[in-house]
């Protein structure tokens, strides 16, 4: 099973983000290569046992086609741990409402604890936008009763520049189970998100990117400044976990760095 990380007398809720493998590498689909990459993903999931409270599977980050988050979750359930606590991102940019319902139903059937409904990055070919938006999607899913069977979460900016912005109000008014931040750079920004969510009874998950050399490019791509915690990410994560309901650790370009930080957290 996957266990909550225990630090001294405190228990914190830390999950880890895994990217499912790309479906196509190069220009052609290669089933043998895909199966090998799935094995690598499940091996990584196995290494996380005892270090995290759960695993979050992403959905085609940067618009690059990958194995679906729900299919990836099924592989982990079947081959690593049937009791693993898993959550899945679901992009709405590529889905209409019937397609979304199918995917959320699949997530429920494989035993995922939650789904993170997000817009998703624009695909490289820049083709296709279903017109569905995350807040509207959650509202429709709740109307259909999906929230009685799985937690419905929404993505949220790491820093709120305008609390009265319609996009912010929409996310709060639909009252998802949790708001999952983009990668945070400061505890003060996280505190503002928690304060916004609290009156609505919404939980907050703080996403923290591992400050490693190999993740610099990813940080630059999203404008993340990790100077506040680069020298001491362990304490930063501990503090974030006290403020928020949970922390989701991401290390997009270095699994080894993420694993090392998780091991430090457990000491």
Label the model's feature ranges.
Residues 2-57:
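Conserved N-terminal beta1-alpha1 strand-loop-helix module at the mouth
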Residues 12, 237-266:
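C-terminal extensions of enzymes
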Residues 12-20, 53-57, 84-90, 115-117, ...:
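Hydrophobic faces of well-ordered beta-strands that scaffold small-molecule active sites
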Residues 15-39, 86-98, 150-164, 218-231:
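Active-site mouth loops of central-metabolism enzymes
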Residues 35-42, 63-80:
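Glycine-rich, positively charged N-terminal anion/phosphate-binding segment
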Residues 64-75, 95-102, 121-141, 184-201, ...:
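Active-site-adjacent beta->alpha loops and helix N-cap segments on the catalytic face
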Residues 114-182, 188, 194, 198-220:
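Conserved anion-binding
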Residues 201-245:
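Catalytic-face loop-and-helix region of soluble metabolic enzyme cores
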């Amino acid at each position: 099973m996957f266990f909550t990380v225990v630090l001294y007398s405190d228990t914190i809720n830390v999950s880890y983000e895994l990217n499912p493998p790309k479906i196509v590498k190069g220009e052609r689909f290669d089933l043998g290569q895909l199966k090998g990459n799935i094995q690598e993903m499940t091996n990584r999931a196995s290494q996380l046992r005892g270090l995290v409270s759960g695993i979050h599977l992403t959905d085609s980050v940067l618009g690059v086609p990958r194995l679906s988050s729900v299919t990836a979750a099924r592989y982990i359930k079947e081959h690593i741990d049937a009791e693993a606590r898993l959550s899945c991102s679901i992009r709405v940019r590529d889905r209409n409402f019937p397609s979304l319902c199918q995917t959320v139903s699949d997530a429920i059937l494989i035993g995922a604890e939650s789904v993170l409904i997000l817009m998703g990055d624009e695909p490289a070919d820049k083709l296709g936008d279903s017109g569905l938006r995350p807040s509207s999607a959650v509202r429709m899913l709740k109307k259909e009763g999906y929230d009685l069977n799985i937690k419905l979460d929404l993505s949220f900016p790491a820093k709120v520049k305008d609390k009265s912005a319609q996009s912010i109000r929409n996310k709060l008014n639909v009252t998802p189970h949790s708001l999952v931040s983009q990668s945070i750079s400061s505890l003060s920004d996280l505190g503002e998100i928690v304060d916004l969510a609290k009156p609505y009874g919404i939980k907050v998950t703080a996403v923290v990117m591992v400050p490693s050399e190999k993740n610099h490019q990813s940080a630059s791509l999203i404008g993340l400044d990790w100077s506040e915690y680069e020298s001491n990410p362990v304490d930063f994560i501990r503090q974030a976990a006290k403020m928020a309901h949970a922390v989701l650790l991401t290390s997009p370009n270095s699994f080894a760095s993420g694993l090392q930080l998780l091991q430090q957290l457990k000491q």
